[in-house]
Amino acid sequence: MTTKEKIKDAFIASVIEKQTVKISDKDIVRRAKISRRSFYNYYADRQSITEDIYIETIESTIKECFDKKMTTEMFITEIYKAFFKNKNFFIVAIKDDEQNSLFDTIIERNQIVFSYLYKDIIQDQIKLDYLSYKYASTQVMLLKKWLNNGMVESPEFMTEVYLDSHKNYENMHESIINKKTNW
């Protein structure tokens, strides 16, 4: 096991055990049985570990899905499955509300993915920036709700909800726009 893997494993185990991401560097170093210097050779802080865990588990899944040229439904399901497989960590990590939290990381990283996907379709850079942020934020808000609810629903169910929200919007818009606003 590499030093970097020891650090991540120690962090994940501590987060799950203590039910918080507010784990000190000292605790991580002690649990990983490494020096502080070794820790700082790889990571600046716990947020950078969280980001690396996200990249390793979720972004690697995204890249695999692209390589396999999966359908949209299969693709989205695999992403939800990757979160589900690591739910003990992600359920705790999503609750962190500090700057550079998992929530911020997912939005930022998803925005990069969406920008990449749509850059050839949407030529206006400002519009691309806003739309990629919109898609990333929408996806992350749905994910956050699922995580905060304890991931009771299946990855397949979440895929259905995610895809339905995009497919049905235009159809629903016509019937919704004519409703009275009496809430």
Can you name each region flagged by the protein language model?
Residues 3, 71, 98, 102, ...:
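Conserved acidic
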Residues 13-20, 67-68, 120, 147, ...:
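Basic, amphipathic alpha-helical hairpins
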Residues 145-183:
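C-terminal peripheral helix-coil segments that are non-catalytic and often amphipathic
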Residues 98-141, 148, 167, 171:
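Amphipathic alpha-helical packing segments from all-alpha helical-bundle domains
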Residues 70-115:
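Helical hydrophobic small-molecule/effector-binding pocket
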Residues 6, 75, 134, 138:
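Charged catalytic carboxylate motif
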Residues 4-12, 16, 21-25, 30-33, ...:
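An amphipathic alpha-helix adjacent to DNA-recognition modules
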Residues 65, 90-93, 146, 150:
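Secondary-structure edge/capping motif, primarily at the C-terminal ends of alpha-helices
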